Amino acid sequence: MSDLHRFQSLKILAHYDRLEAITRGEYPYPIDWHIYPSNHCQHSCEFCLFIQNGEQANYHVKLPRAILLKAVADAARLDARLIHFSGGGEPLLNRHTLEALKLAQQLSSERVSAGGKPL
């Protein structure tokens, strides 16, 4: 395993202020946000939770533009370090995801990723 992926025993010190807040009964906002723009997918993987009897489930969800952009703005306002676009399908099958990605980068999240790939 490379050093990049090895657990760092002192990593907890990077979040010491958050741990102190929790011990005081406070609930700090998450630093990693996962936004699921869509559960639509162009694949039919056998192991997928959204596949039933070899076919995609018939409930398709795409976040509306206003909700998607509000989620990104909220994450940035609350100092998210990572905004990750993923979900039960391909995030880019929601036509508003590109706009949301651009907004996330404009609002200065430290990292933005989609489908497991940093952008």
Task: Map each language-model feature to its residues.
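Conserved alpha-helical substructure of the radical SAM core
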Residues: 2-119
